[in-house]
C-alpha cells in the first residue's frame, strides 16, 4: 500500500469483487410482530390481516425513495459510504425533516 493515496487499490483500478448474495424477499424480514409493534406505537388497537403485506409494500417504496436520494448525495460527494447526513438530507428533500443526527 505504498503511495496510492485515497482508496486502497487506486481509484478506477477495479480489482476482484466480493461475492454478493442474491437479494430476494428481504421485505419478509419485516415480521408481523414488528408491524404490529409499529401500529401499537401509533395508537392502533386492532389490525386486519391484510395490513401486513400492504405495510411491507409501502415501507419498501418509502425506503427505496430515501435510499435512492441518499446514494445520490453520496455519489455527488464522490464517496462510497452513505453517511447519516446523506439520509437526513434525503429525508429533508422529501419534506420529512429529521432532527438529532447532526447538521
From Swiss-Prot:
The keyword DNA-binding applies. Coiled coil: none annotated. The modification N6-acetyl-N6-methyllysine is found at residues 6, 13. It is found in: Nucleus; Chromosome. Residues 1-14 have a biased composition (Gly residues). Residues 1-20 are annotated as: Disordered. One of its GO terms (cellular component) is nucleus. GO terms for molecular function: DNA binding; protein heterodimerization activity; structural constituent of chromatin. Keywords: Acetylation, Chromosome, DNA-binding, Methylation, Nucleosome core, Nucleus. One of its GO terms (biological process) is defense response to Gram-negative bacterium. Residues 17-21 bind DNA. Gene3D superfamilies: Histone, subunit A (1.10.20.10). The modification N6-acetyllysine is found at residue 17. The modification N-acetylserine is found at residue 2. SUPFAM superfamilies: Histone-fold. The modification N6-methyllysine is found at residue 21. Belongs to the histone H4 family. The nucleosome is a histone octamer containing two molecules each of H2A, H2B, H3 and H4 assembled in one H3-H4 heterotetramer and two H2A-H2B heterodimers. The octamer wraps approximately 147 bp of DNA. Core component of nucleosome. Nucleosomes wrap and compact DNA into chromatin, limiting DNA accessibility to the cellular machineries which require DNA as a template. Histones thereby play a central role in transcription regulation, DNA repair, DNA replication and chromosomal stability. DNA accessibility is regulated via a complex set of post-translational modifications of histones, also called histone code, and nucleosome remodeling. This is Histone H4. It comes from Caenorhabditis elegans. The gene is his-1.
